Amino acid sequence: MYAAVKPLSNYLRLKTVRIYDPIFTLHSKCTIVILLTCTFLLSAKQYFGEPILCLSSERQADYVQSYCWTMGTYILPAEVDRDGGSSWEYALYAPTSTAAETFNVSSLRALVAQNEQYARFISIAEGVGPETRGVTKRMYLRYYQWVFMILLFQSLLFYFPSFLWKVWEGQRMEQLCCEVGDALIVEATYRTRLQMLTRYFRAQFAPIHWCYSIKYAFCELLNVFISILNFWLMDVVFNGFWYKYIHALAAIPVYDWNLWNLMTSRVFPKVAKCEMFVYGPSGTPNIMDILCVLPLNILNEKIFAVLYVWFLFIALLAIMNILYRLLVICCPELRLQLLRTHLNGMPKSHVREVLASAGYGDWFVLMCVSINVNPTLFRELLEQLYAKLNQARCTEPVFAEQPCQQVPQLAQVPQLFSHAKLDRCPSRNCSLLIDPTADRHSICTESSHRVTAMPTAPTLNLMAPNDEIISMDRFFHESHA
């Protein structure tokens, strides 16, 4: 048995790169291992023997067992009387005179005719007792042969979301986070991977990251849908499993094992009835009332008690995870706080500035990277992104970022340039006279355009005939004369 279950431990082993959150792991991976382990237990014939044993003559033993295994067994379901109590409750509180009259009947068939409810109460087991053919209701145990197949189908059902996400994920996290998940990293590898991650997140993959995150949210929603589908499936297969078994589980905390045996026997009876027709030599049919023991139900009642609690637990977690996902999508401030938990005290303003230009998809990929890389490297990655954002702002056109000095008024221009020596080139000298109506950004920009020249003369030459440099004061005095 251990050799059969051992390969499942490799499935639960933590991978180098994790692509599932803890709730997803519980819902898919852990549930699959539990269900497959239960399947192996039920199929272990050496521990529980034959799946069915029927009481019959030695000559017909194999035939009867094969017939009842193939055609199925049944029990007599508990009926609710007019006061709302079950058959065994009715018998416990039956009037003394009625019970006395019943005990005076010598035949069991007469007892059935007199009081079938009480006759079934004193029968062999819950659901096994005398019946009136064609009148008494029967509940066939058609699931018994297929329990291990049901568990196997459930394991495949719960595996589907994780398989779908693995296909959609396409090893993106493995490519981003390989070689940097350890506590100690080679310096060259550290720097190389840091530069690659920085370039990746600076490359603006927002639409791809958005699709990536939405696909993961869809797989989480699929987990919830599968949990609900599983509830319905078990309730149909096991004839009201969720309602009946809650009473059995309620008996465990108070150690009421009689109630436990009674309630579990209504879903997983250990003893059941089987009916077979045997024809005589002349063709007259005879009905054989056969009693069968169902050994696997001893294990089924324990397995499904555990699965009852586990399925409720993971369904609740899956619903809470969907609510959390909706909250994270709608609340940027919550995304900021969650990301800061992986940054070891990085200033909040820096993180906010990095996330200001990032959407939910970018944040989701960053969170996935944070749980797969070295914490120091992840913090340095965010610092690099912050530095690149500031550098990008500084390398934008100067008029958009750098402040300029206040432009002097036109009246102050003569005094400002009174002692300045001007260039010999007339075309460059023209640009030194400043248009007072120009904005300060246009004045600071050298590469984009020149400042508009002040309209004076068509050809402005500040050079004397002997190449003497004329001062600005002299130029203004002569021009106004």
Curated annotation (Swiss-Prot):
Q: Which GO biological-process labels does this protein carry?
A: intercellular transport; medium-term memory; monoatomic ion transmembrane transport; phototransduction
Compartments, record wording: Cell membrane; Cell junction, Gap junction
Q: Does the keyword Transmembrane apply?
A: yes
- GO MF term (any one): gap junction channel activity
Which domain of life does this protein belong to? Eukaryota
Q: Membrane-spanning residues where?
A: 22-42, 145-165, 221-241, 303-323
The record's account of tissue expression is: Uniform expression in the imaginal wing disk. Expressed in an outer layer of the pupal developing CNS. Also expressed in pupal retina: cone cells and primary pigment cells.
Q: Which residues lie on this side of the membrane: Cytoplasmic?
A: 1-21, 166-220, 324-481
Q: Which residues lie on this side of the membrane: Extracellular?
A: 43-144, 242-302
Gene Ontology cellular-component terms for this entry are: gap junction; membrane; plasma membrane
Keywords, comma-separated and alphabetical: Cell junction, Cell membrane, Gap junction, Ion channel, Ion transport, Membrane, Transmembrane, Transmembrane helix, Transport
Q: How does the protein's chain sit in the membrane according to the entry?
A: Multi-pass membrane protein
**Keyword Transmembrane assigned:** yes
Function, as annotated, reads: Structural components of the gap junctions.
- PANTHER family reported in the protein's UniProt record: INNEXIN, INNEXIN INX4-RELATED
Q: Family per UniProt?
A: Belongs to the pannexin family.
Record protein name field: Innexin inx6
- Species for this entry: Drosophila melanogaster (Fruit fly)
| Gene coding for it | Inx6
